[in-house]
Amino acid sequence: AIAAVITFLILFTIFGNALVILAVLTSRSLRAPQNLFLVSLAAADILVATLIIPFSLANELLGYWYFRHTWCEVYLALDVLFCTSSIVHLCAISLDRYWSVSRALEYNSKRTPRRIKGIILTVWLIAAFISLPPLIYKGDKGKKPGGRPQCKLNEEAWYILSSSIGSFFAPCLIMILVYLRIYLIAKRRNRQGPHGKQAPGDGDTGPSALGGTSTISKLPPSILPAVGEANGHSKPPGEREGGEQMGDPTSPSTPPNQSSVGPEDGSQKQEEEEEEEEEEEEECGPPAPPTSSSLQGTPNFQPSQGSQVLATLRGQVLLARGPASLGLQPWRRRTQMNREKRFTFVLAVVIGVFVLCWFPFFFSYSLGAICPQHCKVPHGLF
Protein backbone atom coordinates (compact mmCIF):
# COMPACT_ATOMS: atom_id res chain seq x y z
CA ALA A 1 0.00 0.00 0.00
CA ILE A 2 2.79 2.42 0.90
CA ALA A 3 4.64 1.62 -2.31
CA ALA A 4 1.49 2.27 -4.36
CA VAL A 5 0.85 5.63 -2.70
CA ILE A 6 4.47 6.76 -3.08
CA THR A 7 4.52 5.65 -6.71
CA PHE A 8 1.40 7.69 -7.39
CA LEU A 9 2.98 10.73 -5.72
CA ILE A 10 6.11 10.32 -7.84
CA LEU A 11 4.12 10.23 -11.08
CA PHE A 12 1.89 13.10 -9.98
CA THR A 13 4.91 15.22 -9.06
CA ILE A 14 6.63 14.61 -12.38
CA PHE A 15 3.48 15.25 -14.43
CA GLY A 16 2.41 18.39 -12.53
CA ASN A 17 5.81 20.07 -12.57
CA ALA A 18 6.33 19.18 -16.23
CA LEU A 19 3.07 21.00 -17.01
CA VAL A 20 4.33 24.05 -15.10
CA ILE A 21 7.56 24.16 -17.11
CA LEU A 22 5.69 23.63 -20.38
CA ALA A 23 3.18 26.39 -19.59
CA VAL A 24 5.84 28.96 -18.73
CA LEU A 25 7.99 28.17 -21.77
CA THR A 26 5.15 28.09 -24.31
CA SER A 27 2.68 30.74 -23.10
CA ARG A 28 3.47 34.36 -23.92
CA SER A 29 1.46 35.62 -20.97
CA LEU A 30 3.66 33.59 -18.59
CA ARG A 31 7.04 34.63 -19.96
CA ALA A 32 7.60 37.27 -17.30
CA PRO A 33 11.12 37.12 -15.80
CA GLN A 34 9.87 36.22 -12.31
CA ASN A 35 8.27 33.03 -13.65
CA LEU A 36 11.76 31.64 -14.18
CA PHE A 37 11.67 30.92 -10.45
CA LEU A 38 8.79 28.52 -11.08
CA VAL A 39 10.69 26.77 -13.87
CA SER A 40 13.74 26.23 -11.66
CA LEU A 41 11.60 25.16 -8.70
CA ALA A 42 9.68 22.69 -10.85
CA ALA A 43 12.95 21.27 -12.18
CA ALA A 44 14.21 20.73 -8.62
CA ASP A 45 11.00 18.94 -7.66
CA ILE A 46 11.18 16.70 -10.73
CA LEU A 47 14.75 15.75 -9.81
CA VAL A 48 13.63 14.89 -6.29
CA ALA A 49 10.84 12.71 -7.66
CA THR A 50 13.08 10.86 -10.10
CA LEU A 51 16.47 10.56 -8.37
CA ILE A 52 15.68 10.63 -4.65
CA ILE A 53 12.24 9.29 -3.75
CA PRO A 54 12.47 5.93 -5.58
CA PHE A 55 15.75 4.99 -3.87
CA SER A 56 14.49 6.20 -0.50
CA LEU A 57 11.40 4.06 -0.93
CA ALA A 58 13.50 1.01 -1.77
CA ASN A 59 15.76 1.63 1.21
CA GLU A 60 12.80 1.85 3.60
CA LEU A 61 11.02 -1.21 2.22
CA LEU A 62 14.12 -3.43 2.13
CA GLY A 63 15.60 -2.18 5.39
CA TYR A 64 19.10 -1.86 3.94
CA TRP A 65 20.94 -0.16 1.07
CA TYR A 66 20.66 -2.46 -1.89
CA PHE A 67 22.63 -0.33 -4.37
CA ARG A 68 26.33 0.36 -4.77
CA HIS A 69 28.50 2.19 -2.28
CA THR A 70 29.41 4.95 -4.77
CA TRP A 71 25.78 5.68 -5.56
CA CYS A 72 25.10 6.02 -1.83
CA GLU A 73 27.52 8.93 -1.62
CA VAL A 74 26.04 10.62 -4.68
CA TYR A 75 22.51 9.91 -3.50
CA LEU A 76 23.07 11.57 -0.12
CA ALA A 77 24.56 14.68 -1.72
CA LEU A 78 21.76 14.96 -4.29
CA ASP A 79 19.14 14.46 -1.60
CA VAL A 80 20.38 17.48 0.35
CA LEU A 81 20.99 19.50 -2.84
CA PHE A 82 17.55 19.11 -4.40
CA CYS A 83 15.53 19.41 -1.19
CA THR A 84 17.46 22.46 -0.03
CA SER A 85 17.16 24.04 -3.47
CA SER A 86 13.40 23.53 -3.46
CA ILE A 87 13.03 25.21 -0.07
CA VAL A 88 15.36 28.12 -0.85
CA HIS A 89 13.47 28.69 -4.12
CA LEU A 90 10.32 29.33 -2.10
CA CYS A 91 12.24 31.80 0.04
CA ALA A 92 13.57 33.59 -3.07
CA ILE A 93 10.06 33.82 -4.53
CA SER A 94 8.78 35.42 -1.32
CA LEU A 95 11.59 37.99 -1.38
CA ASP A 96 10.89 38.74 -5.05
CA ARG A 97 7.24 39.39 -4.25
CA TYR A 98 8.16 41.61 -1.32
CA TRP A 99 10.52 43.76 -3.39
CA SER A 100 7.96 44.06 -6.18
CA VAL A 101 5.38 45.30 -3.66
CA SER A 102 7.51 47.57 -1.48
CA ARG A 103 9.69 48.99 -4.28
CA ALA A 104 7.41 48.64 -7.28
CA LEU A 105 8.88 51.26 -9.61
CA GLU A 106 12.53 50.73 -8.69
CA TYR A 107 12.55 46.93 -8.54
CA ASN A 108 10.30 46.21 -11.53
CA SER A 109 12.65 48.19 -13.76
CA LYS A 110 15.55 46.03 -12.53
CA ARG A 111 13.67 42.72 -12.69
CA THR A 112 15.31 41.49 -15.87
CA PRO A 113 15.81 37.86 -16.96
CA ARG A 114 19.52 38.23 -16.29
CA ARG A 115 18.91 39.39 -12.72
CA ILE A 116 16.43 36.59 -12.05
CA LYS A 117 18.85 34.01 -13.44
CA GLY A 118 21.53 35.41 -11.14
CA ILE A 119 19.24 34.93 -8.12
CA ILE A 120 18.42 31.39 -9.24
CA LEU A 121 22.13 30.63 -9.59
CA THR A 122 22.68 31.93 -6.06
CA VAL A 123 19.93 29.64 -4.79
CA TRP A 124 21.57 26.59 -6.33
CA LEU A 125 24.99 27.62 -4.99
CA ILE A 126 23.59 27.88 -1.47
CA ALA A 127 22.05 24.43 -1.82
CA ALA A 128 25.30 23.03 -3.22
CA PHE A 129 27.29 24.50 -0.32
CA ILE A 130 25.01 22.80 2.20
CA SER A 131 25.17 19.50 0.31
CA LEU A 132 28.98 19.30 0.19
CA PRO A 133 29.55 17.72 3.64
CA PRO A 134 27.86 14.41 2.71
CA LEU A 135 30.51 14.02 -0.01
CA ILE A 136 33.40 15.04 2.24
CA TYR A 137 32.22 13.22 5.35
CA LYS A 138 30.96 9.89 4.12
CA GLY A 139 28.54 9.41 6.96
CA ASP A 140 27.54 6.06 8.39
CA LYS A 141 27.51 3.54 5.59
CA GLY A 142 28.71 0.66 7.72
CA LYS A 143 26.91 -2.59 8.32
CA LYS A 144 24.35 -3.60 10.84
CA PRO A 145 25.05 -6.57 13.07
CA GLY A 146 23.30 -8.69 10.46
CA GLY A 147 25.86 -7.64 7.86
CA ARG A 148 23.58 -5.56 5.64
CA PRO A 149 24.94 -2.25 4.29
CA GLN A 150 23.38 1.06 5.32
CA CYS A 151 23.34 4.49 3.69
CA LYS A 152 22.82 7.36 6.13
CA LEU A 153 23.74 11.00 6.36
CA ASN A 154 26.47 12.27 8.62
CA GLU A 155 25.12 12.04 12.15
CA GLU A 156 27.51 14.53 13.73
CA ALA A 157 25.67 17.20 15.70
CA TRP A 158 27.37 20.17 14.01
CA TYR A 159 26.30 19.06 10.55
CA ILE A 160 22.76 18.16 11.58
CA LEU A 161 22.17 21.56 13.18
CA SER A 162 23.90 23.61 10.48
CA SER A 163 22.16 21.81 7.61
CA SER A 164 18.78 22.03 9.34
CA ILE A 165 19.17 25.76 9.92
CA GLY A 166 20.41 26.46 6.40
CA SER A 167 17.95 24.16 4.64
CA PHE A 168 14.76 24.87 6.57
CA PHE A 169 14.64 27.00 9.71
CA ALA A 170 16.31 30.12 8.27
CA PRO A 171 14.31 30.09 4.97
CA CYS A 172 11.12 29.35 6.91
CA LEU A 173 11.65 32.30 9.24
CA ILE A 174 12.41 34.59 6.29
CA MET A 175 9.28 33.45 4.46
CA ILE A 176 7.00 34.03 7.44
CA LEU A 177 8.38 37.53 8.11
CA VAL A 178 8.33 38.50 4.43
CA TYR A 179 4.79 37.31 3.79
CA LEU A 180 3.63 39.02 6.98
CA ARG A 181 5.17 42.25 5.73
CA ILE A 182 3.55 41.79 2.30
CA TYR A 183 0.18 41.29 3.98
CA LEU A 184 0.52 44.47 6.03
CA ILE A 185 1.54 46.51 2.98
CA ALA A 186 -1.30 45.12 0.87
CA LYS A 187 -3.80 45.72 3.67
CA ARG A 188 -2.71 49.33 4.10
CA ARG A 189 -2.79 50.07 0.37
CA ASN A 190 -6.12 48.33 -0.05
CA ARG A 191 -7.68 50.66 2.51
CA GLN A 192 -6.30 53.77 0.86
CA GLY A 193 -8.28 55.63 -1.75
CA PRO A 194 -7.03 56.81 -5.15
CA HIS A 195 -3.77 58.77 -5.32
CA GLY A 196 -2.65 57.29 -1.98
CA LYS A 197 -5.33 59.12 0.02
CA GLN A 198 -7.30 57.51 2.79
CA ALA A 199 -10.38 55.74 1.51
CA PRO A 200 -13.82 57.14 2.39
CA GLY A 201 -15.07 55.94 5.72
CA ASP A 202 -11.58 55.49 7.25
CA GLY A 203 -11.63 58.64 9.33
CA ASP A 204 -11.89 61.17 6.50
CA THR A 205 -14.46 63.79 7.52
CA GLY A 206 -13.53 66.48 5.02
CA PRO A 207 -15.72 67.78 2.25
CA SER A 208 -14.64 65.03 -0.11
CA ALA A 209 -15.83 62.29 2.21
CA LEU A 210 -19.13 64.07 2.76
CA GLY A 211 -19.86 64.35 -0.95
CA GLY A 212 -18.87 68.00 -1.23
CA THR A 213 -17.44 69.60 -4.34
CA SER A 214 -13.94 70.83 -4.94
CA THR A 215 -13.00 74.34 -5.97
CA ILE A 216 -13.06 75.14 -9.66
CA SER A 217 -10.08 76.97 -11.04
CA LYS A 218 -10.68 80.64 -11.57
CA LEU A 219 -10.77 81.49 -15.23
CA PRO A 220 -11.65 84.70 -17.08
CA PRO A 221 -15.39 85.22 -17.63
CA SER A 222 -14.87 84.92 -21.38
CA ILE A 223 -13.79 81.31 -20.96
CA LEU A 224 -16.55 80.12 -18.63
CA PRO A 225 -19.32 80.21 -21.28
CA ALA A 226 -17.38 77.59 -23.21
CA VAL A 227 -18.31 75.00 -20.62
CA GLY A 228 -22.03 75.59 -20.80
CA GLU A 229 -22.72 72.35 -22.61
CA ALA A 230 -23.41 69.44 -20.30
CA ASN A 231 -25.42 66.32 -21.01
CA GLY A 232 -27.25 68.05 -23.84
CA HIS A 233 -28.25 71.07 -21.71
CA SER A 234 -27.04 74.42 -23.03
CA LYS A 235 -26.52 77.55 -21.01
CA PRO A 236 -29.59 79.83 -20.86
CA PRO A 237 -29.31 82.51 -23.50
CA GLY A 238 -30.08 85.42 -21.29
CA GLU A 239 -27.81 84.58 -18.37
CA ARG A 240 -25.20 87.22 -17.66
CA GLU A 241 -21.90 86.82 -15.93
CA GLY A 242 -23.39 87.81 -12.62
CA GLY A 243 -26.04 85.10 -12.81
CA GLU A 244 -29.00 87.37 -13.73
CA GLN A 245 -31.53 85.65 -16.01
CA MET A 246 -32.80 87.38 -19.15
CA GLY A 247 -35.65 85.90 -21.13
CA ASP A 248 -37.01 82.38 -21.21
CA PRO A 249 -34.44 79.85 -19.90
CA THR A 250 -35.94 77.12 -22.05
CA SER A 251 -35.53 78.96 -25.33
CA PRO A 252 -32.81 78.00 -27.88
CA SER A 253 -29.28 79.12 -27.13
CA THR A 254 -29.08 82.54 -28.84
CA PRO A 255 -27.43 85.79 -27.79
CA PRO A 256 -29.68 88.41 -26.10
CA ASN A 257 -29.20 90.96 -28.87
CA GLN A 258 -30.55 88.49 -31.45
CA SER A 259 -33.74 87.53 -29.64
CA SER A 260 -35.82 89.16 -32.38
CA VAL A 261 -34.26 87.14 -35.21
CA GLY A 262 -36.75 85.26 -37.39
CA PRO A 263 -37.27 81.51 -37.20
CA GLU A 264 -35.16 80.78 -40.28
CA ASP A 265 -32.24 82.90 -39.08
CA GLY A 266 -32.55 81.50 -35.60
CA SER A 267 -32.55 77.90 -36.75
CA GLN A 268 -29.57 78.58 -39.03
CA LYS A 269 -27.69 80.12 -36.14
CA GLN A 270 -28.55 77.18 -33.92
CA GLU A 271 -27.28 74.71 -36.55
CA GLU A 272 -24.00 76.61 -36.78
CA GLU A 273 -23.61 76.50 -33.01
CA GLU A 274 -24.37 72.78 -32.95
CA GLU A 275 -21.73 72.17 -35.63
CA GLU A 276 -19.24 74.18 -33.59
CA GLU A 277 -20.10 72.14 -30.49
CA GLU A 278 -19.57 68.89 -32.41
CA GLU A 279 -16.16 70.09 -33.61
CA GLU A 280 -15.21 70.94 -30.03
CA GLU A 281 -16.34 67.52 -28.81
CA GLU A 282 -14.33 65.76 -31.52
CA GLU A 283 -11.16 67.64 -30.62
CA CYS A 284 -11.51 67.63 -26.86
CA GLY A 285 -13.52 64.49 -26.15
CA PRO A 286 -17.05 64.26 -24.78
CA PRO A 287 -17.74 67.07 -22.32
CA ALA A 288 -18.59 66.25 -18.75
CA PRO A 289 -21.10 68.23 -16.69
CA PRO A 290 -19.46 71.08 -14.77
CA THR A 291 -20.18 71.92 -11.17
CA SER A 292 -19.25 75.57 -11.23
CA SER A 293 -21.24 77.80 -8.94
CA SER A 294 -22.19 79.87 -11.98
CA LEU A 295 -23.88 76.83 -13.52
CA GLN A 296 -25.64 75.44 -10.48
CA GLY A 297 -28.72 77.49 -11.28
CA THR A 298 -29.12 76.04 -14.76
CA PRO A 299 -32.53 74.34 -15.19
CA ASN A 300 -32.51 70.53 -15.32
CA PHE A 301 -28.81 70.51 -14.43
CA GLN A 302 -27.55 67.33 -12.76
CA PRO A 303 -23.83 67.27 -11.97
CA SER A 304 -21.92 64.10 -12.74
CA GLN A 305 -19.74 62.32 -10.19
CA GLY A 306 -16.94 61.17 -12.46
CA SER A 307 -15.50 64.07 -14.47
CA GLN A 308 -12.49 66.08 -13.37
CA VAL A 309 -11.46 68.22 -16.37
CA LEU A 310 -13.46 69.73 -19.23
CA ALA A 311 -11.31 70.95 -22.10
CA THR A 312 -12.68 73.30 -24.77
CA LEU A 313 -11.27 75.31 -27.62
CA ARG A 314 -11.27 78.39 -25.40
CA GLY A 315 -9.74 77.00 -22.25
CA GLN A 316 -9.79 74.30 -19.61
CA VAL A 317 -11.88 74.10 -16.46
CA LEU A 318 -11.29 71.76 -13.53
CA LEU A 319 -14.45 69.99 -12.50
CA ALA A 320 -15.37 68.67 -9.09
CA ARG A 321 -16.49 65.38 -7.57
CA GLY A 322 -13.74 63.11 -8.83
CA PRO A 323 -13.48 59.51 -7.69
CA ALA A 324 -11.61 60.50 -4.53
CA SER A 325 -14.47 62.73 -3.37
CA LEU A 326 -17.24 60.19 -3.43
CA GLY A 327 -19.14 59.47 -0.28
CA LEU A 328 -19.08 56.30 1.75
CA GLN A 329 -19.84 53.29 -0.43
CA PRO A 330 -20.66 50.06 1.41
CA TRP A 331 -19.89 47.90 -1.62
CA ARG A 332 -16.34 49.23 -1.71
CA ARG A 333 -15.82 48.36 1.93
CA ARG A 334 -17.16 44.86 1.34
CA THR A 335 -14.84 44.45 -1.65
CA GLN A 336 -11.87 45.48 0.47
CA MET A 337 -12.79 43.03 3.22
CA ASN A 338 -13.26 40.16 0.75
CA ARG A 339 -9.93 40.95 -0.89
CA GLU A 340 -8.15 40.93 2.46
CA LYS A 341 -9.76 37.62 3.42
CA ARG A 342 -8.80 36.04 0.09
CA PHE A 343 -5.21 37.29 0.34
CA THR A 344 -4.95 36.07 3.93
CA PHE A 345 -6.23 32.65 2.92
CA VAL A 346 -3.68 32.32 0.10
CA LEU A 347 -0.80 33.26 2.39
CA ALA A 348 -2.03 30.87 5.07
CA VAL A 349 -2.16 28.02 2.56
CA VAL A 350 1.32 28.75 1.17
CA ILE A 351 3.00 28.99 4.56
CA GLY A 352 0.86 26.32 6.22
CA VAL A 353 1.51 23.64 3.60
CA PHE A 354 5.21 24.45 3.55
CA VAL A 355 5.57 24.17 7.34
CA LEU A 356 3.34 21.10 7.54
CA CYS A 357 5.40 19.20 4.98
CA TRP A 358 8.89 19.99 6.22
CA PHE A 359 8.72 20.86 9.93
CA PRO A 360 8.16 17.32 11.32
CA PHE A 361 11.22 15.95 9.55
CA PHE A 362 13.62 18.78 10.41
CA PHE A 363 12.35 19.01 13.98
CA SER A 364 12.89 15.32 14.68
CA TYR A 365 16.18 15.38 12.73
CA SER A 366 17.50 18.29 14.84
CA LEU A 367 16.18 16.83 18.06
CA GLY A 368 18.41 13.81 17.61
CA ALA A 369 21.48 16.07 17.56
CA ILE A 370 20.50 18.17 20.57
CA CYS A 371 19.79 15.28 22.94
CA PRO A 372 20.56 12.00 21.20
CA GLN A 373 20.07 9.84 24.31
CA HIS A 374 16.87 11.14 25.90
CA CYS A 375 15.07 12.80 22.95
CA LYS A 376 15.49 10.13 20.34
CA VAL A 377 12.48 9.84 18.05
CA PRO A 378 11.22 6.30 17.38
CA HIS A 379 12.35 4.98 14.02
CA GLY A 380 8.81 4.30 12.82
CA LEU A 381 7.68 7.84 13.60
CA PHE A 382 10.79 9.30 11.99
UniProtKB/Swiss-Prot annotation:
Record keywords, A-Z:
Cell membrane, Disulfide bond, G-protein coupled receptor, Membrane, Receptor, Transducer, Transmembrane, Transmembrane helix
Q: Which GO terms describe its biological process?
A: platelet activation; regulation of smooth muscle contraction; regulation of vasoconstriction
Q: Which locations, inside or outside the cell, does it occupy?
A: Cell membrane
Ranges annotated as spanning the membrane: 1-25, 37-62, 73-95, 118-140, 157-180, 347-370, 380-382
UniProt xrefs under SMART domains: 7TM_GPCR_Srsx
Show the segment(s) annotated as Disordered: 192-305
| Cysteine pairs bridged by disulfides in the record | 72-151
The molecular function terms of the Gene Ontology recorded here are:
alpha2-adrenergic receptor activity; epinephrine binding
Instruction: Fetch the InterPro entries from UniProt.
Output: ADR_fam, ADRA2B_rcpt, GPCR_Rhodpsn, GPCR_Rhodpsn_7TM
Q: Would you say which domain of life the source belongs to?
A: Eukaryota
Keyword RNA-binding found? no
PANTHER family recorded: ADRENERGIC RECEPTOR-RELATED G-PROTEIN COUPLED RECEPTOR (PTHR24248), ALPHA-2B ADRENERGIC RECEPTOR (PTHR24248:SF130)
According to UniProt, the name of this protein is Alpha-2B adrenergic receptor
Organism for this UniProt entry: Didelphis virginiana (North American opossum)
